[in-house]
Amino acid sequence: MTLEQQSQNSLLNSFNETRNTTLQLVKNLERDDFGVQTAVFMSPPKWHIGHVSWLNEIVLSKTQQDYKFFSEELSEYLNSYYNQFGKPHDKSKRGVMSRPTVDEILEYFEVITNRVREVISKPLDKETMYLFTMAIHHECQHQELLVYDLQHLLGDQYRPAKRNESPISLNKEKKKIRINGGLYNLGYSGKDYCYDIELPEHKIYLNDYQIDTFPVSNAEYLEFMNEGGYDDYSFWLSDGWDAVEKNEWNSPMYWEKDEDQWITRDFVGKRKINQNEPVCHVSFYEASAYCKWANKRLPTEAEWEKAALWNNEKGVKTDFPWGNEKPTESHANLLESNIWNCSDIGSYENGKSNYGCYQMIGDVWEWTTSEFVG
């Protein structure tokens, strides 16, 4: 469905679903959890739910004549980096603020939800519909951020509102796929919503390359660790080795050594590392070092995208690895799957790409060698 074709009901339903998902993520938190900031790179839960409401209010102010803000004082705290709306509060100090209170933020969330519902229940022009669609996608982005902040904040103490079982993987044989190079159109050219950083679509030349069909597993990463991967500087970029020594890295974040085995504390609980799950919570430097140890390399953004989206038989790029059908629970492990841990490598047969690559979306974010210059 294009933006031009999107109905009022579709926009309203998407908005309601998104707001409900945000509330579900914090449903089982204690009041004391909402304001805690455990690291400079994360934000307190109350900031996230306030910030997504603030962005919706910015859209309201841009589209509604004589709009009156709920509270001018909230803006500085809830602004992230939009200097045109005032000086943002220092991100590293979001957790030192006891005001606004959790109750004030939750009230703000409810008020803005109702204000947006009232506006988008009526006919909208194209520009207004686009801005509210952008706000929905922005909130989905912060749901991802909220989840990884909850991992850092609570780990195995977090209780999701709903949990489903992970599918059983019947495919454990990792292969290398050869992909022919040539000119490739990187970026987006469709009519659905996209971020400006996905534009414009442009041609890029690729050499022939090979890519694994599965993400790197915990078992594979353990081999790197057991063979001294964190002790041998020759595998590491210079900045990466500095980080290893400064931070005393010896494993992925959230891994702990318990006598003779590695365990983790995640949304499932305190548990032994599942060797069939994709390795996660590793930095770019760790991913790069692993690849050098394994005599491989990380793909570029364009190489990754072609392996994920290019249908070589039809000569077209698809919206998703499996085609243009919207994601379902049979395609990928996404937030709405409510699984709350990674699925085993080789899961989601229906979600593999035309080249045969699995889990190209869902489960984990994947590193590339391409620098983000947006």
Feature map (PLM): residue ranges:
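Short, helix-capping/interhelical loops that line the mouth of catalytic, cofactor-
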Residues: M1-S10, L60-T113, G155-S166, Q261-D266
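N-terminal regions that are enriched for targeting/export leaders
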Residues: T2-D32
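Short glycine/proline-rich turn/loop motifs
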Residues: T2-E4, H89-R99, K122-P123, L199-Y205, ...
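Active-site rim elements
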Residues: Q5-L11, V96-L106, M129-F132, N207-Y209, ...
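A non-catalytic, amphipathic alpha-helix used as a structural packing/dimerization or gating element
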Residues: N13-Q24, E104-V111, R115, Q141, ...
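Short, contiguous alpha-helical
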Residues: D32-K87, S121-S169, T213-N218, L222-E223, ...
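Functional-site microenvironments in short loops/helix caps that host divalent-cation chemistry
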Residues: A135, E139-Q141, L145, D149, ...
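Core segments of cupin and vicinal oxygen chelate
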Residues: F224-G228
